[in-house]
């Protein structure tokens, strides 16, 4: 990759094969995705998912160590399929305007307080990584207000879906996503190695000193 001089609609770093591909476009989310408003009307789904700022979309039981939602009120929850995205308006230090995450685990249901949407193109990991940046935060601050509880962002569905997103060629999007994904895999592998080394050290310390 090479740093480019144009800092407008062209990123600072760009893969060589895309340097002459022109500027990126800015397209509203509504032209790239659709809101998913399917409700769990018959209560057939009972796997409740949540979107945390730190871990993304996770099973509620794993995150809270218990079921927060009860079976009786799941019929009003949104159905979220694997590959869907979800916006949690809850404000935190890690997510000052709330996190947007991709559901990479399984089909389940989400609180109606969340916004669930689905990209038209299934190859959309590029946007999953974009939503981990702060590039969209300014728009959310400008078009939303803090809710009555002062811990949630209040934004209309129309304003949320009008969010401008940076868009480039699908090939470049995929290249970026693949690059960042490979780094994620490397980080995971190194973390596992570090964990193994810590365990090995602990075992040595127990054996190198008299009990």
Placement of each model-derived feature along the sequence:
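A short glycine-rich beta-alpha junction/loop motif
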Residues: 9, 107-113, 145-171
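Short coil/turn segments at secondary-structure boundaries
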Residues: 42-50, 142-144
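A short beta-sheet element
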Residues: 75-136, 149
